[in-house]
UniProtKB/Swiss-Prot annotation:
InterPro entries according to UniProt: Rotavirus_A/C_NSP5 (IPR002512)
Region Disordered, residue ranges: 13-38, 53-72, 85-106
A Pfam family of this chain: Rota_NS26
Broad class of where this protein is predominantly found: host cell
Family per record: Belongs to the rotavirus NSP5 family.
Taxonomic lineage of the native organism: Viruses, Riboviria, Orthornavirae, Duplornaviricota, Resentoviricetes
Modification after translation, per record: O-glycosylated. Hyperphosphorylated on serine residues, when in dimeric form. Phosphorylation by host CK1 is required for the hyperphosphorylation of NSP5 dimer.
Name assigned to this protein: Non-structural protein 5
Residues that bind Mg(2+): D92
Keyword annotations from UniProtKB, A to Z: Glycoprotein, Host cytoplasm, Magnesium, Metal-binding, Nucleotide-binding, Phosphoprotein, RNA-binding
Amino acid sequence: MSLSIDVTSLPSISSSVYKNESSSTTSTISGKSIGRSEQYISPDAEAFNKYMLSKSPEDIGPSDSASNDPLTSFSIRSNAVKTNADAGVSMDSSAQSRPSSDIGYDQMDFSLNKGIKIDATVDSSISISTTSQKEKSKQENKNKYKKCYPKIEAESDSDDYILDDSDSDDGKCKNCKYKKKYFALRLRMKQVAMQLIKDL
């Protein structure tokens, strides 16, 4: 950020190398007085320019230019209207305090407004099972009565095994006419499966 100042437009600018005078004027912030040593200079713009140009930019500080301080810059502008060029303009405020209600004094009041925004978000997840009791019991019964088929063995396809009464379900399907066809089909499927396994 760059700040350019036209010193010729100011009635007078204070510096520590010029004449010192005292004043009781202060600038207040929120009703509090700021006390610093008051400094004045004569309205000789050429002398001030010469002094400022003789210093390197690194050595120039707030004591060399009143405009570097925002509070003092405001004080210069307000006092320049109320005083003439011969009286000088205050660079810094004095150690004395003054009532903020006096007419004719400059006063700056700063108010800080804080905006607080609260954004509260609550996320909830509820899982509800809508399975009816009837469907649940049906599924349990299905799993309960799931038939476990016996392991297929090589000798299970023999004629003796097919005609054996142990394969019948309580005599309901004893030596059924479809039993031989079933075991023949099962033997063929087993051979195909074994051939696929060999090919892999």
